[in-house]
Amino acid sequence: MRQLAIRSKLILILILALLPIGLSALVSATLSEDAASNHGFINTLLDGLLIAGILPIVTMVLATSSFGNELEDRTLSYLVLKPVPRWLIVLPKLMASIVVGSIALIVSGAVATLLGGSSIGAVLVVLDGSLQATLAVGVAVFVGVVTYAAIFTWAGLVTSRAIAFALIYVFLWEGLISSFLGGVRYLSVRGYSLAILHGLDDTSFEPLRERVIEFPAAVVGAAVTTAVFFWLTVRRLRQMDVP
């Protein structure tokens, strides 16, 4: 049963990771390379689909179940009774989610970026600006995965309904509220990723200019959020009453 659940998660992650690539290839093959299609590629596919949707969902699937086996088997007590610092227990769990999520999503974002958009465009013009854009997408996605992983690993220890919590958080806070209230972007993982994306290549991602926070604020915000939720996870593990 557990192997089936793991296989289902991996299949879901693979499908979600392939979705931007497939859509990007379709758009690149059917639409003309003009400013309008470039804006649509950035706002709809990169932001709306990858960064706002697929990135948090994939990371949620991985991170909320970081301690799932131990909680299900009631073996978490064996972990916490070991004479090792709690952060050394949390860190490998967090890193596992980050590594798997980053590989899938960075490849997805990079290939989609090479295939779609005008100046971001085809592989044949990879040296004409699109390499920088691809690297920017990779870094922005990585930052998003790391930050979300810290939040959702903590959620997996705090509540047995971590996935429900994560979905509400992603679609309400990251999706709806941050889209209408500009100040919320300073407390939004999506806002951090978009600001880093634009900050690393403001020419290719110029359509984002009016709705991103400052690049330094995004870097600091992502780092602080990751550190805070890592600390909260360690603290939660230390205080848990495990059977």
Please provide the spans of the model-predicted regions.
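Aromatic- and glycine-rich beta-strand/loop motifs that create alpha-glucan
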Residues: 1-14
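Short cytoplasmic-facing helical segments at TM-TM junctions of multi-pass membrane proteins
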Residues: 75-79
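Alpha-helix N-cap/helix-start motif at helix boundaries, enriched for small hydrophobics
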Residues: 87-90, 237
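Juxtamembrane non-transmembrane "cap" segments at the membrane-aqueous interface
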Residues: 174-200
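Pore- or pathway-lining transmembrane helices of multi-pass membrane proteins that form conduits
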Residues: 11-16, 159-178
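Short helix-to-coil transition segments within interhelical loops
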Residues: 80-85
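Secretory targeting signals
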Residues: 22-66, 90-159, 178, 196-201, ...
